[in-house]
């Protein structure tokens, strides 16, 4: 039952979801008008659409190579827009005879797998090729730093160029990296992986889940055969004196290598696209893919002459070198929102794991507006290359409100970078990150309690979800919970108490942390269950949400203090005693006789009648009953089922004036006595929250009023 309830209570407490719809509409309008300003579309004879004057909120990060246009100038010549695009040309020239070679038998099989079935999204071939290009440039950069004389054409800038051609249906990706010699081309492109292709095939046969083992072999380049019918590669090694070569293949089993002139240092890949993949010759589509997967690659990526990746990867920078404005704009880029984050966590470590991360915690969330459950807000990178957007498992589901980036070189990835091979490692990384975020929030709560209390009013539901669904973190999360208590003077959202604060204010003789579930503060302060604690100045936490009692029940203990409902029998350490006001009116025989009479005449609701000294102002009270919140959750689990209120053990204050007078009426006026005892019992049920519809009391109350007035 508890597991079922856990699924239901996560959606409780959302009665006011739509109260801010006007604000939401306003924000959406603001987002639309702020993000896109001054769009002008120009059509030339070739139906080329150019968007001029795009202004982004992230202007600090975005730059443009487009010539400056005066704001009042509404016209721009189509020819000028075309000239702004710099296309990569195939200017190389082959010399000599081609050498035709065959792929290894195993490599042919693997090539078919890669081209046809490995990747779930074809578009990732661009990510793979950019990642390879970045690696190649990094190699030549490192060599140039350590031994510049070993690098050919050291003055060539480190950059990745991409060119689209819709007329010829081609896509070209060129880098100024380390390049390849002829032997390296045969070694790297003629066979797959250094771990042994036969072993690779063997593992594929043993494991039906190709993605689980294929990451052990380097086959990223071959992803371009998913979209291309012919692949041409011009390459020249960075080693001084190296020759240039052309590698060409249609992926059917063989390839050719030919010496070529006019080849620049690095590698140029020309993909002649299949008809089913012509969309990758369109600039807009390729640009979106670059921004999706490779926005933070460490080297410039120019698409048709314009740099695309102009956003700084803040998680790689020194936290002290980043301004507040940069953080704000980076957060808005990640979250696609326009609020200011409440908190941020910039965390890096090299031991025991390599982690570079930055997290932002928003100031508001959309679930409360009825927008549906949010998706994970953290993206996973490896060396600044996107592995998974909205990554599952990096943070637990209850932390889905967090926005950010995690970059780790320790993550072993499959070749397509779409499945993680080592879930155990991901869990270790997740554990480190969750612990760091919770610690940061706890520190913030202590440094600025008022700000944190406002934050928890907005996001407290997510942390309560975490306690219910993620037992591992319940102790850490419980430190962040905030509740109103009997010590507060008002119902202010900033006048909340943590469990740690509660414990620090406990009486020396107090053993437990006490809570009371009530609809509101006024009901709590007037509750007969609170009365004995009020008399002894014992603080009681008030819970107003149905989920809160379930949350504290799951927490169980805070340190060595048990969390107890004041309505339970365990709360008897602070039972009020009315001995001082006690009058010796009733003998024990009279008490026993009265309790026996109650058990008989009220048997439809009372299983046992007992005497108590727990309450002073109320004639009767129910202890250890099924809570009203629990009953509400049962109804959510089984909405069509009738849940009858079970009989209860009712405890009577035998010194209360009503009870003293009622004892006398049991024999002299049994009709009135029956009406009174039924009302006293029902009042106890109401105080316990066990009666939701009080209308059945009305006829009885009318009878009592009539009897009173006819005397």
Curated annotation (Swiss-Prot):
Domain of life the protein comes from: Eukaryota
Entry's localization field: Cytoplasm, Cell cortex; Cytoplasm, Cytoskeleton; Mitochondrion; Spore, Perispore
Keyword Cytoplasm set for record: yes
Dimerization: annotated span: 303-711
Gene Ontology biological process terms from the UniProt entry: cell differentiation; positive regulation of gene expression; protein folding; sporulation resulting in formation of a cellular spore
Keywords: ATP-binding, Chaperone, Cytoplasm, Cytoskeleton, Mitochondrion, Nucleotide-binding, Nucleus, Stress response, Transit peptide
Gene3D superfamilies to which the protein is assigned, alphabetical: 3.30.230.80, 3.40.50.11260, Heat shock protein 90, C-terminal domain (1.20.120.790), Histidine kinase-like ATPase, C-terminal domain (3.30.565.10)
Record InterPro entries: HATPase_C_sf, HSP90_C, Hsp90_fam, Hsp90_N, Ribosomal_Su5_D2-typ_SF
Primary site of residence: cytoplasm
Residue range covered by the transit peptide: 1-62
GO cellular component, one term: cell cortex
GO molecular function: ATP binding; ATP hydrolysis activity; ATP-dependent protein folding chaperone; protein kinase binding; unfolded protein binding
Positions bound to ATP: 132, 175, 188, 221, 417
Deletion phenotype: Defects in prestarvation response, sporulation and in resistance to heat shock. When overexpressed, induces precocious aggregation, however, development arrests before the tight mound stage.
Homology family: Belongs to the heat shock protein 90 family.
Role according to the record: Chaperone that expresses an ATPase activity.
Matching NCBIfam families: PRK05218.1
Name used for this protein in its record: TNF receptor-associated protein 1 homolog, mitochondrial
Annotated organism of origin: Dictyostelium discoideum (Social amoeba)
Gene symbol of the encoding locus: trap1
């Amino acid at each position: 039952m508890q597991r079922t309830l856990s699924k239901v209570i996560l959606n409780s407490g959302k009665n006011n979801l739509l109260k801010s719809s006007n604000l939401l509409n306003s924000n959406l309008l603001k987002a639309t008008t702020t993000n896109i300003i001054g769009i002008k579309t120009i059509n030339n004879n070739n139906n080329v659409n150019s968007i001029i004057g795009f202004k982004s909120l992230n202007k600090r990060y975005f730059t443009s190579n487009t010539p400056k246009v005066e704001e009042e100038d509404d016209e721009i010549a189509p020819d000028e827009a075309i000239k702004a695009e710099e296309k990569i040309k195939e200017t190389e020239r082959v010399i000599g005879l081609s050498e035709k070679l065959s792929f290894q038998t195993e490599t042919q099989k693997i090539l078919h797998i890669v081209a046809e079935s490995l990747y779930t999204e074809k578009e990732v071939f661009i990510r793979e090729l950019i990642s390879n290009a970045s690696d190649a440039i990094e190699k030549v950069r490192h060599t140039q730093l350590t031994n510049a004389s070993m690098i050919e054409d050291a003055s060539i800038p480190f950059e990745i160029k991409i060119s689209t051609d819709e007329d010829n249906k081609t896509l070209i990706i060129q880098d100024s990296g380390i390049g390849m010699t002829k032997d390296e081309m045969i070694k790297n492109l003629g066979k797959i992986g250094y771990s042994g292709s036969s072993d690779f095939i063997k593992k594929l046969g043993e494991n039906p889940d190709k993605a689980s083992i294929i990451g052990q072999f380097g086959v990223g380049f071959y992803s371009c055969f998913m979209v291309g019918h012919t692949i041409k590669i011009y390459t020249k090694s960075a080693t001084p004196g190296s020759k240039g070569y052309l590698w060409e293949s249609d992926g059917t089993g063989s390839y050719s290598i030919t010496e070529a002139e006019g080849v620049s240092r690095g590698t140029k890949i020309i993909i002649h696209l299949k008809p089913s993949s012509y969309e990758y010759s369109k600039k807009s589509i390729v640009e979106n893919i670059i921004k999706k997967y490779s926005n933070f690659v460490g080297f410039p990526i120019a698409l048709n002459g314009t740099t695309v990746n102009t956003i700084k990867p803040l998680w790689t920078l020194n936290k002290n070198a980043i301004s507040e404005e940069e953080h704000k704009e980076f957060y808005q880029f990640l979250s696609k929102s326009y609020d200011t984050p409440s908190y941020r966590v910039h965390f890096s470590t090299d031991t025991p794991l390599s982690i570079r991360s930055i997290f932002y915690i928003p100031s508001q969330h959309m679930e409360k507006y009825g927008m549906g459950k949010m998706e994970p807000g953290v993206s996973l990178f490896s060396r600044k290359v996107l592995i998974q957007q909205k990554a599952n498992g990096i943070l637990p589901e209850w932390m889905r409100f967090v926005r950010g980036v995690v970059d780790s070189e320790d993550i072993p990835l499959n070749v397509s970078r779409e499945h993680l091979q080592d879930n155990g490692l991901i869990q270790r990384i997740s554990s480190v990150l969750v612990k760091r975020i919770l610690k940061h929030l706890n520190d913030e709560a202590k440094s600025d309690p008022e700000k944190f209390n406002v934050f928890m009013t907005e996001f407290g539901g997510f942390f309560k979800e975490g306690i219910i669904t993620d037992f591992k973190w319940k102790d850490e999360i419980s430190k962040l919970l905030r509740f109103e208590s009997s010590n507060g003077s008002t119902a202010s959202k900033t006048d909340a108490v943590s469990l740690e604060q509660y414990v620090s204010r406990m009486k020396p003789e107090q053993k437990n942390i006490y809570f009371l579930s009530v609809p509101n503060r006024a009901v709590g302060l007037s509750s007969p269950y609170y009365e004995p604690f009020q008399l002894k100045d014992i603080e009681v936490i008030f819970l107003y949400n149905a989920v809160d009692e379930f949350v504290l029940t799951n927490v169980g203990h805070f340190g060595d203090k048990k969390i107890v409902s004041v309505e339970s029998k365990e709360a008897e350490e602070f039972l009020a005693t009315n001995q001082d006001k006690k009058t010796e009116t009733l003998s024990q025989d009279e008490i026993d006789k009265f309790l026996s009479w109650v058990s008989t005449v009220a048997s439809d609701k009372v299983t046992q009648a007992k005497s108590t000294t727990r309450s002073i102002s109320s004639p009767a009270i129910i202890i250890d009953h099924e809570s009203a919140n629990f009953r509400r959750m049962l109804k959510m689990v089984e909405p069509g089922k009738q849940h009858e209120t079970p009989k209860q053990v009712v405890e009577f204050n035998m010194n209360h004036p009503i009870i003293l007078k009622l004892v006398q009426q049991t024999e002299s006026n049994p009709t009135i006595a029956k009406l009174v005892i039924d009302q006293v019992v029902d009042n106890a049920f109401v105080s316990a929250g066990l009666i939701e519809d009080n209308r059945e009391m009305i006829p009885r109350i009318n009878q009592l009023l009539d009897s009173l007035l006819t005397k």
